[in-house]
Structure formats: structure tokens, C-alpha cells
């Protein structure tokens, strides 16, 4: 597991969430040393933030689609 302060922005929501769930299990079960747990916690924060960003992007895209008044569907990339 990578514990660097940079997270690959190309990681999918599902991959990030799965890794975050594994980190939570390890910390909850006490399977790591204190130092490893702190590193895992730091990685978990990065993953949580990444998941929140992906969810926000999806929500904004859905809002744009549903606000179209003339019933035509167009997708426009949203920068967050």
C-alpha cells in the first residue's frame, strides 16, 4: 500500500472506497503497528477526500442533466 501524500487522481471511486474500507478494517482490528496505523490513517484521509470529490462531481453532473428544460440531454464536463 502506498502511503505517500499524493493520491493518483485517476483512481476510481470504487477502488478508493475499497482501499479505504480495508484500511478501516486493519485499524479497527489492531493489525498494524502504531506507525503503520498512523500512515494508514493518513492514506485513509486522502482516500476519503478523493471519494468526496468524485461524489460531488457526479452530483453536479446529475444536477445539470436534470435541470435541462427542453428535455434534451447533453453532458457538459464540470470542473471542481
Swiss-Prot record:
Instruction: Enumerate the Gene Ontology biological process terms.
Output: DNA catabolic process
Which domain of life does the protein's organism represent?
Bacteria
GO cellular component terms, semicolon-separated:
cytosol; exodeoxyribonuclease VII complex
Citing just one GO molecular function, the answer is: exodeoxyribonuclease VII activity
Reaction(s) catalysed by this chain, per the record, are: Exonucleolytic cleavage in either 5'- to 3'- or 3'- to 5'-direction to yield nucleoside 5'-phosphates
Going by the UniProt record, its keywords in alphabetical order are: Cytoplasm, Exonuclease, Hydrolase, Nuclease
Principal EC category? hydrolase
Subcellular location per UniProt equals: Cytoplasm
Q: What is its main location?
A: cytoplasm
Role description: Bidirectionally degrades single-stranded DNA into large acid-insoluble oligonucleotides, which are then degraded further into small acid-soluble oligonucleotides.
Of which family is this protein a member?
Belongs to the XseB family.
Protein name, UniProt field: Exodeoxyribonuclease 7 small subunit
Source organism (scientific name): Rickettsia bellii (strain OSU 85-389)
The top of its lineage is: Bacteria, Pseudomonadati, Pseudomonadota, Alphaproteobacteria, Rickettsiales
